């Protein structure tokens, strides 16, 4: 266990290096996970020898547990119910069937290459099916990428652990022979798969209601509201674990309750949670870098590298190609979504769960996971900026179907019979006399760049971002103005 001075040094490294490196990382074929995993390798036993950690070290377990609980909670809170319902088929197919196909392909690869047992192969396949939102962050924030594609990647990365985690918990129970009868399995299912989410949802709902009422009555300081959000995560985790449920599923359920019940809570809760989560994730990358550098000696390197190639270049693209073959997206979008399914911190955290559960051979599985994750972080992190730019330029040069997802028609949802077309001459007359309408230039990227003509006073909104703009505009203006405002969407 590292001493207090070492712990402070690690915290200092996370805070200073992340801030200084962020500007360079945004412009270079790099990512912060590459930087911090590399820092872990550097200070580990096979580097400078500053820090030595084992897979079962208490510091690693504590940081990893907090990180995964926070990540799951925040992923759920960010899921706006309306946005997920209207997201379309693409993210749902990637999340469900796509994830299961990756599990199967990775499992077969592990079984053939590593000679692991069926259960061990399934554990490894499940661990390696987790998509990392940290490595994807630069991609999903790039506004040159159509919103529907970014949303597909974001929803999948943010929620596929909820598909994977129950599978992993069942496999851990099988590996440890925790249940041997029908009654035993029924009790396990209730405790882990139902009790945890139920406890988490109840705590998330109750805590949100309490803070909403307290803030309305006493105007709670944003500082304390920010801390309250972290407390809700920890409370949900602890209560679920104490009652025999799963704390991680409880953390997600607590966040989901906050999202769908839509209490009027301070944005600071999410902002501070994301800041805390970011620091915990980067610290986790350092610690895992230290551990992985030591475990590499135990991993069958060549088979592990071959498995990494299968997971990255075969399993993910194959799964996405199958599930999206009839989706309304271009081949470029299929290739883009198929490529950006990086394995990262989430896979390492899931592997650590297996180690902590005492599964036989778990450290070997974690060593292989470390090899695959290292390859993925380097390859996907290095390709994020150039491939995003390449796809963005392609979108600006042509009209792709995914750019029309979430298009201007959404702004008139619920009033389709009132939607009328207006000719340019009619629009000119309306603009000259009477209360002017709000004109939105919603042409696709390629047409907007090619045709430099502009309507005076028009607001530029990309076609895939109209619904998001409409929600924000309605929130910012009084209801009387919203109801009386005429809107004209200009497209080609």
Question: Residues of each region from the PLM?
Answer:
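Catalytic cysteine-centered active loop of the rhodanese-like fold, especially the PTP/DSP P-loop
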Residues: 470, 474-492
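Transmembrane helical cores of multi-pass secondary ion antiporters/exchangers
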Residues: 1-402
